[in-house]
Amino acid sequence: QIMALAQWQRGLSLVKKVVYALDKFTIVYISILVVYIFHVDKGGDGLFSCQLLYDMESIRNIAIIAHVDHGKTTLVDKMLVEAQTFSDREEVGELLMDNHDLERERGITILAKNASIRYKDVKINIIDTPGHADFGGEVERVLKMADGVLVLVDAFEGPMPQTRFVLSKALALGLRPIVVINKVDKENCTPEEVQDKVFDLMFTLDATEEQLDFQTVYGSAKQGWMGPDWKNPTEDITYLLDLIIEFVPEPETAEGSLQMQITSLDYSSFVGRIAIGRIYRNSLKVGQPISLVKRDGKIVKSRIKELMIYEGMAKKKVEHVQAGDVCAVVGLDGFEIGDTITDQENPEALPPIHIDSPTMSMLFSINNSPFFGKEGKFVTSRHIRERLDKELEKNLALRVEDTQSADTFMVYGRGVMHLAVLVEEMRREGYELQ
């Protein structure tokens, strides 16, 4: 028994030594396996997507298109309020999305803008698009961020020419529409006839069978209700929000390395220029090295300094943004609208954004009248050229050419409204021109 006990103790000691030796190997092996499975560096071929490390969020990206004064901005205001975007202490005004002075004065949307709401644990990114054809350059690029569209139509006027223009762009991109017939509280309105006109318009624009099988919502954004029957007003606009969740598809998350296209930009006096766009593949995180692929194919190495997503009307800093979401990126130098943010080691560019050519031109020159310098502070040709160059960075539908005179520039735009807004903006900023 004593000999058996001694032999057992020697065996136990040997087992302990073997286990101790294997322990270090096991830790290293398991660590390598975990890295392989989850691929922390984002962009490899692990067994599971790296996004499993984060809470995946259900997202809907929807653009709202409408003719001028059909109630689009008012509807967005109601959606923001319905989703309790504002705290009890905040004073909620009107025309929240039209925060540009000229937009409020003229009652039109000039610049495409982004906001988001949360409803039933779903994040809905709202893309507000201009309704006037002169601002089609804004429309064409921001529609690429959407997976569906709300087609807002006046119950009395029906679909108008500008509705046709924007809707044709949305249908060509394969976006599925939800038709919202607004202002059913108007006297002598004909909602059923308007719905038939919308169907005829879509058929004329070569909509697919799936696009023609659209859902219709009736209501009054001003009164704050939406429902399936215009004769029976509801209490709120939740019927519309439920339809968005049900019929607008979730963003497709294709396999592969990072791809994000810059579709608009913002500016902050603290961080400079901010790139805004949608992530089509993989994900982004703060500090991640990336490649910026330019329109001409040139590749610039860079790194993400800050990431922001939209929460209501504001931007919120985050550490990580998943595929399908719309975000703002800080830290990129020399980017342009249409550039692709992609993986640093395996850069893959997205197709460039196509914008229709300008249709008219206007001569911009210095003020050489007797009242030179009386109203503005930027009066030289250099000032005017620098301002036009700045506008070219964000206004894709604009084109500027030099003339034989150093004091005159030929500016091409999409229409009278397009160029008139630019002139008025420059005048208010202190530029003198004629």
Q: Which residues fall in each region the model found?
A:
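Polybasic, lysine-rich low-complexity intrinsically disordered segments
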Residues: 2, 17-18
